[in-house]
Design a protein with these regions (language model features):
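Switch/communication elements of ASCE P-loop NTPase nucleotide-binding domains
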Residues: 115-341
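P-loop NTPase switch/coupling surface
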Residues: 1-119, 217-222, 259-260, 274, ...
Length: 341
């Protein structure tokens, strides 16, 4: 299965999900899907960055064939699509590390490059870079691209096969919103002619309304409006200070994107949580502080926009206090475990 979850299912497994658009229920090996409101759905781009993301450093990754339809395959395709934007003339800054990434299509094998910002100190392949850089680079690149530029490039990369699929979808939408029929032969009598003219005029406006509905539904089903980012273990191979810097930059980047963009992070790192709490606290006190410099400031966010949970004994529970900040007991316990060790 796509997320490799099939081995976690048994005869007693129950899965329920409901949104404004769809209801999904899985029980007793039976899957039931109901559309609640098919007219409000807006397509999203989902970008999943797995813990295996370091594979982007592999030479000739574009020649690697992933036969199984897994999240790793989707990640690889998204990476290959996004990296083309950052050529030698459009290098990508990697946080505040004085390093940049660029893609060199002229290279035969090592096409992904890391260069010092001064352009002189070194110019190496991503394959030869540290594991930390190999972990950070896909996060920074894909967040930067799919947060903004992707929406401008979307139609440019539509293949012929995809265009055929879209035409089939357009035909399906036409069947949902059919045009009304009307009598084209107007009667010779004034009263009937007038009546039929009114009917025809009404149909014209109705046709316009139907065309607008068709267009709106087609756009909502085919054109991505927002991106859902899912990052697995952003702390991977990073020193605590680098984890903090990455979290601050990630939140800053999300704030710059389209309204409705969504970020989901899974983590085992207390440093990621501490950094997130700094941004939540900054969001609460931003109107009360001035003339002070905080490294987290560009990542400050509203506590109302954030939910934080942990899985404990198989149950999902919130670890936020009433003010939206991380629970002090939770932070203290995490800190004590590290200090006591």
């Amino acid at each position: 299965m796509y997320h490799k979850m099939h081995n976690y299912f048994n005869d007693s497994t129950v899965v329920r999900y409901e949104s404004d658009v769809i209801s999904i229920n899985y029980a007793k090996d039976t899957l039931t899907i109901k559309l609640l409101d098919k007219f409000i759905y807006k397509r999203k781009k989902i970008v999943y960055m797995p813990s295996d993301r370091n594979l982007v450093a592999m030479p000739e990754l574009d020649k690697l064939i992933l036969t199984n339809k897994t999240n790793l395959q989707s990640f690889t395709f998204d990476w290959l699509n996004a990296r083309n934007t950052f050529d030698k003339s459009h290098k990508l800054n990697l946080l505040d590390l004085d390093m940049q990434y660029y893609y060199d299509s002229t290279e035969q094998i090592y096409k992904d490059k890391i260069v010092h910002s001064n352009g002189k100190t070194y110019d190496i392949s991503l394959y030869d870079a540290s594991s930390g850089l190999q972990s950070i680079t896909p996060i920074v690149l894909m967040l930067h691209y799919y947060n903004n530029q992707y929406f401008n490039d979307f139609e440019k990369f539509t293949s012929y096969e995809k265009q055929q699929e879209l035409q089939q979808l357009a035909d399906k939408i036409d069947s949902i919103f059919p045009f009304p029929t009307h009598n084209e032969h107007l009667d010779s009598t004034d009263s009937k002619s007038y009546s039929q003219t009114i009917e025809h005029t009404g149909n014209v406006f109705l046709h316009m309304e139907i065309k607008n509905k068709r267009k709106k539904m087609y756009q909502q089903l085919t054109t991505p409006y927002t991106t859902d980012f899912i990052i697995e273990e952003p702390e991977q191979n990073l020193f605590p200070e680098a984890q903090e810097a990455l979290l601050y930059w990630t939140l800053e980047e999300i704030k710059r994107g389209n309204d409705g963009n969504y970020l989901f992070i899974t983590t085992h790192s207390p440093y990621i949580l501490f950094a997130l709490n700094n941004c939540l606290m900054g969001g609460l006190v931003k109107d009360k502080v001035s003339n002070q410099d905080f490294s987290s400031e560009k990542g400050w966010i509203d506590v109302k926009d954030v939910s934080i949970y942990e899985i404990h004994d198989g149950k999902l529970q919130s670890i936020q206090d009433n003010d939206g900040l991380l629970n002090n007991n939770y932070l203290n316990q995490a800190n004590k475990k590290i200090a006591n060790e």
